[in-house]
A protein has these predicted regions:
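N-terminal [4Fe-4S]-dependent radical SAM core
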Residues: 1-58, 66-141
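Glycine-centered loop/turn positions within well-structured domains
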Residues: 63
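Conserved AdoMet/S-adenosylmethionine-binding subsite of the radical SAM
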Residues: 137-275
């Protein structure tokens, strides 16, 4: 399988993924196509907290982040095969359990925090906690594998990121939109696969929002952390907003690696786009 980034003139990612004693590129071990249908290796799929949306945890990634909390399935091929059609049916099944319908501009993780803090106090003890936003009726709160909260009308792709192989995401997005009446699609991403060409395809396929994890501003730090350049990742916010996607940016404070200087630079980048 030829690297789709290289075909577009970009550099291949740090995408070696392990399976037993062998290592291959993530797209070779966690993605396949049979009779025109794409299949993705999925570790799990469920209503997640504190995001309050249905998360699909993907195996394999184009980054090799030192701080990855999902390395057991992003850097190691681990999970079950799901076709894009099967994921579309999962989305339809989840839609029947949705308790909160969000407008498109709220298709972010951040907007989950002003709805519910996932403490479960209202369900377990019949009273709200001191930190409860006080917005939702108890009937909107459901239990998931990660705790209590609402179920928002959002399907999110998380875990490993191979958006560089955009055709899978385009096909699965179309399946989700076909199977659901009112469902938004969010991709949690490191941004490495968000080339202008790929963003055009994702927009045309029905993707609504990106949760972009900018891991560092300075390229030397980024490369040490993730194994790749961040050259076009820093351009991604502009390209995303230009195409009318919803954008949320995440940056983690990592002592001695990503501290105030890096976060200030990333903040200025965002501010220049949307003062």
């Amino acid at each position: 399988m030829k690297c789709k980034l290289v075909e577009q003139g970009f550099k291949i990612g740090s995408c070696l993924t392990s399976k037993g004693k062998t290592s291959k590129r993530a797209c070779e071990l966690t993605l396949k196509r049979i009779n025109g249908i794409w299949y993705r290796l999925i570790k799990s799929a469920h209503l997640s907290r504190p995001e309050h949306y249905f998360s699909i945890y993907q195996s394999g990634c184009n980054h090799s982040c030192l701080k990855c909390h999902s390395w057991k399935f992003t850097q190691i091929a681990n999970g079950d095969w799901f076709s894009t059609q099967e994921i579309g049916l999962l989305a339809r099944k989840y839609e029947n359990k949705v308790t909160v319908y969000e407008p498109r501009e709220r298709v972010t993780m951040w907007h989950a925090t002003d709805l519910c803090r996932s403490c479960g106090s209202c369900v377990l003890y019949g009273k709200r906690s001191m930190t409860c936003p006080g917005i939702l009726d108890t009937s909107k709160i459901v239990l998931s594998p990660q705790g209590f909260g609402p179920a928002r009308n959002i399907i999110a792709f998380t875990g490993g990121d191979i958006v560089c192989h955009v055709d899978f995401y385009c096909q699965v997005s179309k399946e989700i939109k076909k199977n659901c009446k009112n469902m938004w699609i969010l991709i949690e991403t490191n941004g490495y696969g968000l080339t202008p060409q790929n963003l055009n395809k994702l927009r045309d396929s029905g993707v609504d929002s990106f949760w972009l994890d900018i891991k560092a501003y300075d390229e030397d730090i980024y490369r040490k952390l993730c194994g790749t350049t961040n050259e076009w990742i820093l351009k991604a916010p502009y390209e995303i907003l230009k195409r009318d996607f919803i954008l949320e940016v995440l940056t983690l404070f990592i002592p001695e690696w990503v501290e105030d200087d890096q976060i200030i630079k990333i903040s200025k980048l965002i501010y220049e786009l949307d003062p």
